[in-house]
Amino acid sequence: FKLLLITNFEYEFSEMDLEVIQWKKESEISDLNKIDIGLYPIHMDEWSLGKGGLKIMQYMAVGVPGVATNYGTAQHIIDHGSNGYLVSTDQEWVDVLKLLIDNENLRSQISANALYDLEKNYSYNAVKDLYLNILNSIYNHHDN
């Protein structure tokens, strides 16, 4: 396998086949479409609590299974083993990646579930009524 990093940093790992693509807003979608599995390891600290949600949703949107640290926002988006994977230890990272790398059918099923869940829970159609209700509530509260 090849590890593809889309980042603003330079990396070199002599132990593996690695390609680094500089992150650019203009090419982000086409770059994400080059991957088979989306990885989102984060540190378990206060700063990282709000991270992970958008990245996981981007993986879901381009149809790849996401694997994320079991921490923060990712815990609320990923249904472990259904639409992605949550991992906590180095061994869990290894086990889940091996499972996904070796099983194209599983990757396809997880990807399909992820896209379905994204559309069901986070698309414009899924959230528009919620936002309208919130805005109406604010407006009505302000009028009283």
Identify the function of each model-found stretch.
Residues 101-105, 134-143:
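Short, hydrophobic alpha-helical segments
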Residues 25-31, 38-58, 68-76:
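Nucleotide-sugar-dependent
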Residues 4, 67, 85:
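Conserved beta-strand positions in the Rossmann-like core of class I SAM-dependent methyltransferases
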Residues 4-34:
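Nucleotide-activated donor-binding/catalytic signature segment of Leloir-type glycosyltransferases, i.e.
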Residues 8, 69, 89:
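Cofactor-binding loop segments of dinucleotide-utilizing enzymes, especially the Rossmann-like FAD-
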Residues 37, 61-66, 82-83:
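Structural loop-to-beta junction motif characteristic of Rossmann-like glycosyltransferase folds
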Residues 79-91, 99-105:
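Conserved acidic donor-binding segment of nucleotide-sugar-dependent glycosyltransferases
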Residues 99, 106-121, 127-133:
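A short, well-ordered alpha-helix in the C-terminal region of glycosyltransferases
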